[in-house]
Amino acid sequence: MSNEVLTQTKERMEKAVAAYSRELASVRAGRANPSLLDKVTVEYYGAQTPLNQLSSINVPEARMLVVTPYDKTAIGDIEKAILKADLGVTPTSDGTIIRIAIPALTEERRKELVKVVKKYAEEAKVAVRNVRRDSNDDLKKLEKNGDITEDELRASSEDVQKLTDEYVSKIDSVTKDKEKEIMEV
């Protein structure tokens, strides 16, 4: 019984860390990366459509993204959506493709991005701790129902805490790497 709870705990904590990693991918670190545009949605035929479903996104140079729309009539809408996403970039179009020059980050902007990364890290840690709380509640219910003994409850709770510590340290490690990447000039 308690093994099922531990398995679910591990899966949910893994998902929380994976979600955090995806969130970090959208934080710009001076180099062009197609994931920068992952959250951009375009008003296309009356529906909000992710940009990566309407176009291909390439990186021809270290500080340049090229968006090639599958439907050339959507270029204006795509440009507006990129501007509206407030990514700190300005798209330029030649009628068939959209070029996005990634400006070098200023020291001030780097520090702002580090704060954003730390905020995301804290949210991810809270998510992991919420999983811990839910798992401990589930274990207590099992013990109350007589499915596990008090000793098994204590041992399982310690295992849940070890998992929590492991995933929080993973978050810290990923955060440290991202901060280093951002502060790199």
Swiss-Prot record:
Region feature Disordered, mapped onto this chain: 136-155
GO molecular function: ribosomal large subunit binding
UniProt keyword Protein biosynthesis, yes or no: yes
Protein known as: Ribosome-recycling factor
Gene Ontology cellular component terms for the protein in this record: cytoplasm
Entry function: Responsible for the release of ribosomes from messenger RNA at the termination of protein biosynthesis. May increase the efficiency of translation by recycling ribosomes from one round of translation to another.
GO biological process: one example: translational termination
Broad class of the protein's primary localization: cytoplasm
Gene3D superfamilies xrefs: 3.30.1360.40, Ribosome-recycling factor
UniProt KW keywords: Cytoplasm, Protein biosynthesis
A Pfam family per the record: RRF
Compartment(s) where it occurs, according to its Swiss-Prot or TrEMBL record: Cytoplasm
Keyword Zinc-finger: no
UniProt record similarity statement: Belongs to the RRF family.
Domain of life the protein comes from: Bacteria
